[in-house]
Amino acid sequence: VQHDSKRRPEERRFYTQVTDPMREARLIQDSGELEAALFRLRSADRLALDTEFMRERTYHPQLCLVQIGTEADCYLVDPLAPLDLGPLHVLLQDRSKHKILHAARQDLEVLLLSGGAVPGPLFDTQVAASFLGFPPQVGYAELVARQLGHSIDKGQTRTDWSRRPLTPAQVAYAADDVRHLLTLHADLQAALVAKGRAGWVAEEAAAYENPALYRTDPAH
């Protein structure tokens, strides 16, 4: 992702810079850790959500990591560890909790394959930004830089997420992918409401919850 320091007027920050209070990420690799994480996550009404996956060696993407954040906590759930992910998917499908993602479609595809349903309800910060004057495919790092003034290291973009153990650089990268999502959501949603465009984003998000979007035929 290129960090372009030049902003068009409509791409300026809508609010003053804030510091995200989210704690250091915790890697979840056993059932006890997952149970404790889910207990804390259930008290939140918004969940920052991202995944890491691999496509190169399989037709369908292989889920390698699920990152979930709240205002206070950040968890990296390891699907390659001996975990029952059923309770995690129940949480992701809980409609009392909004899931905040960036460029959500591929993440939703891999979560559908893993859990049998598309998480929801959704808010996609890339879609929201596009209705506020940003380029339609604005990257997460670029949006965070322009909107919040934070710099994100994207050096692990092409890393092998299926290898274990994860390196400290991978853990830091994965955590950064959710660390700013809740702040972005609050920022962008307020701007959308002010411009009368919040309904447009909600319609787009509702369409993303249709499982038919992610069904493919390997024969074609």
What is the predicted role of each segment?
Residues 5-6, 10, 14-220:
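DEDD superfamily 3′-5′ metal-dependent exonuclease/proofreading module
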